[in-house]
Amino acid sequence: MFPIKYIDNNLVWNKDNEVFAYYELIPYNYSFLSAEQKFIVHDSFRQLIAQSREGKIHALQIATESSIRSMQEQSKKLVTGKLKEVACQKIDEQTEALVSMIGDNQVDYRFFLGFKLMVTEEQLNLKNIKKSVWLTFTEFLHEVNHTLMNDFVSMPNDEINRYMKMEKLLENKISRRFKVRRLEIHDFGYLMEHLYGRDGIAYEDYEYQLPKKKLNKETLIKYYDLIRPTRCVIEESQRYLRLEHEDKESYVSYFTVNAIVGELDFPSSEIFYFQQQQFTFPVDTSMNVEIVENRKALTTVRNKKKELKDLDNHAYQAGSETSSNVVDALDSVDELETDLDQTKESMYKLSYVIRVSAPDLDELKRRCDEVKDFYDDLNVKLVRPAGDMLGLHSEFLPASKRYINDYVQYVKSDFLAGLGFGATQQLGETTGIYMGYSVDTGRNVYLQPSLASQGVKGTVTNALASAFVGSLGGGKSFCNNLLVYYAVLFGGQALLLDPKSERGNWKEMLPEIAHEINIVNLTSDKDNAGLLDPFVIMKNVKDAESLAIDILTFLTGISSRDGEKFPVLRKAVRSVTQSDSRGLLHVIDELRREDTPISRNIADHIDSFTDYDFAHLLFSDGTVENAISLDNQLNIIQVADLVLPDKDTTFEEYTTIELLSVSMLIVISTFALDFIHSDRSIFKIVDLDEAWAFLNVAQGETLSNKLVRAGRAMQAGVYFVTQSAYDVSKESLKNNIGLKFAFRSTDINEIKQTLEFFGIDKDDENNQKRLRDLENGQCLLQDLYGRVGVVQIHPVFEELLHAFDTRPPVQRNEVE
C-alpha cells in the first residue's frame, strides 16, 4: 500500500516508476476580492492546470500546525530601546496567556501540488537502446536485492539528473503564474507523519533525515528511513481507521465524492477557501487528477453519446417516452462535445477525497456529520465507502495512484480552477505586535507598524501613516491606544494629542512604563500663558512664521485671496519674525504701529481673542520659554476645556470657543513636526485623536499632508483617529495611508465611503453587511500588502482593557 519508492529533493518516485515533482503553493489572499479579481485568479489557475496536456496532478490541502511560542520568540527579536526588558516580559506573559487559551499550536492550512513528469521521447539509436536495456537489467537486480534483503533502495544518478532537468523547466512554467516553493525532505516527512496520526509538532520545528549514500553511478537510501514516518499500528474498520502510537491514538475517516448535483457556480464554489472558515477542526483534502487528452476525451464523449442515443431509440421503438434524465444527458453531451471540439481542451478524471480525524469515535462521528452537511449545502454528495478506508488513505501519500474508479468525476479545468485551491485569508505579518485574531480563520494577527517604509517585497504601500475610522463606541480609540502602547514597548516613541483628556490615568494604570510616560496638561492657568504661541513652541523660525499666519487667518477668517487684509497681516507677522522678541502679542503691536484703518481693524479683531477663555495659551509677549519636553518614550499632550465642534457642523457655524479649540489642535499638531524631525533611527508615532476636527478645515488639511510627508522621510507614522472615512478619503491623504482600521458603522453612505477608502467593492451587499454587523472590538483591517479581513482586537491583559477603555463607567448598585 505504501507507494513511495524513492525521494530526491522535491522529486518522488513511486513503485510504478512514475516521477512526481512536488511544490508548496504559497497561499494567496482571497477575502474581500471583487468578482473581477476572483476571475483573474480563477483564470490563472485554469491555465496552470491546462498547461499539462497529459500526465497526472496531485493536489493536497493539509491542516498543518504552527507554533505560537516560536512566533512570539521571533517577535521578541524585534524589540529595541529603553523598554526592552519590560517588552520581553510582556511578550512572555502574552505567550503563556495565548497558549492557555488555544494551545501550543494553531492550525495553518498548506497547499501542495505534485505534477507527474512526462518522459520526453528519446531519439531511437543503438546507444539509447543499450542504455535502456542496462537500466532495465540493473533495476531488476536491485528489485531482487530489495526483495531478498529489504534493506536499501537505489536510483541511477543519470535517472535523477534527467528528471531534475525536467523539473527545472516545470518550475519555471508554474512560477510565472503562482508563487511556489520546492518541497524538501522535511516537508515529505511531516506530510507522512501527519497522515499517520502524528500531531502536536509545529511545521517549522519538524525535522526528518533521509541519509543518502552517493556512489559512482547510483544513489542508495535505506528503505527503513523512507518508511520511518509511517510508524504506527493501523486497525482498519469498515468506515474508519484507528491509528495507534506509543503515547496516543486517533481515529480517521475518509469521504469521497459520489455525485455533484447541479452546477457549482463560480464565484461561490470555492470549497477549499470556505471549508477553512467553516470547520473548527482540521480537515485535509486530496485531489488526484488524471489528464485525459482532447482526442481521447472526445472519443469517450462520442461513445457516451451513442449509448444515450441507443437508449432514446429503444424507448421510441418500444412506444414509451424517453426519461428526462436521458434527454438532459444528451443535451449536456452535445454541449460538452462542441466545447471540447472548439477549445481542444483536455478532460480530467478527478478523485476527490476528504480526510477527517478526531481523538475519539464520538468526536469523529460529529465531525463527519458536519463535513457531510457542509458539502450537502454545496450540492456535493459525499460517501464513506465501506472497507475502502486504507485505500483512500493511500491516495493522500505523495506519488500515489487513484485507488478506486467507482467515484471518479469527469471535469474540465474550469471546475478545478473554481474550487479555490490555495485561497486563504492572510492578514498582517508572521511576527510583531499581537493585535488579535482573524474572525474568519481564528489565526493570530501580528502587525509591524514601522515595516512599510522598509520596502518589503509584496507591500502595496510605503506609507507609515494609519487611519482608525468608525462611529462612536465601536472600539477605534481602544485599538489605536493598544497599537501605540505596543509600538512604544517595541522601541518606538509616541506623541499623543489627547483633546478629550482620556489618557490622564495612564501613569497609574500602566506602572511598568510609568517612568517613560510624560503627560503635559495645558490648563487655562495664567502660568501657562503663551505656551502654545507658534513663536514659542516651534524651534524653526520659518515654521513658526508659517504657523502664526495659519492660526491668525484661521481665527480672523482672513483669506489669502483677500488683497486688502492679507498683505497687511502677512507684513506684520514677518516684522515680528525678524525682530528679537517674538510672540503673537507683538503682531497686534506691529499692526497698531502701521496705524491704517485696515491694520487697526485686524489688530482689534485679534486682540478680542487674547483674553477669551483659554486663548491666552496662544498669545505670548516673547518672554515665555518652551516648557514642553518630548524626550520620553510616550508623550501625551492634553488641553483642558477644549470644546470641539460637532462632526456635522460647518466651518461657518463654528462658535468662538470652537474656533479657538480647533486652532489649539492645529498648533499642537504642527508642533509634532519638531517631534517627527528628531532621531531618524527611532520609529515615531504622532497620534491625532478626534482628527476630523482639523481635517475639515483648509489649514488642518494642509498640515496633515505636511505631517504625513515629513513622517515618511523621518520614519514617523501619523495616526488619524476619526469618525468618518470621508475625513481621510481626499486623494492627497488617502494614498499616503498604510494600515487602515474600520469599526462598525450603520449609516449606508458612511459604509460605502469606508469600503471605497479600503479599495473594495462598495456596492457589494456582502461587504456592506460585514461592516454593518461588526461587533464591538471587531474591525475591518487592511494591511501593508493591501489584504483585507475582519479582526477581533484582543488586549490579552485585563489592565490594558481598563487603561484603554474610553467608555463611561457603569454605575452598579452593590447588593448587601
Question: What is each PLM-predicted segment?
Answer:
Residues S100-M101, N540-H586, S729-E816:
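P-loop NTPase motor core of the ASCE superfamily
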Residues M1-Y410, G420-F421:
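Extended, folded cores of ATP/NTP-driven motor/assembly subunits in large transport
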Residues D312-H314, R443, S450-V484, L497-G504, ...:
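Conserved P-loop NTPase motor cores
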Residues A35-R53, T64, Q276-F279, V292-T299, ...:
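P-loop NTPase motor domains
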Residues R53-K56, Y109, F490-G492, I517, ...:
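Short glycine-/polar-rich loops that comprise or flank the Walker A/P-loop
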Residues N125, V439-V445, S450-A452, K457-G470, ...:
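Charge-patterned, long linear interaction tracts outside catalytic cores
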Residues Y485-L495, E508-M509:
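Post-Walker A helix-loop "phosphate-sensing" segment adjacent to the P-loop in P-loop NTPases
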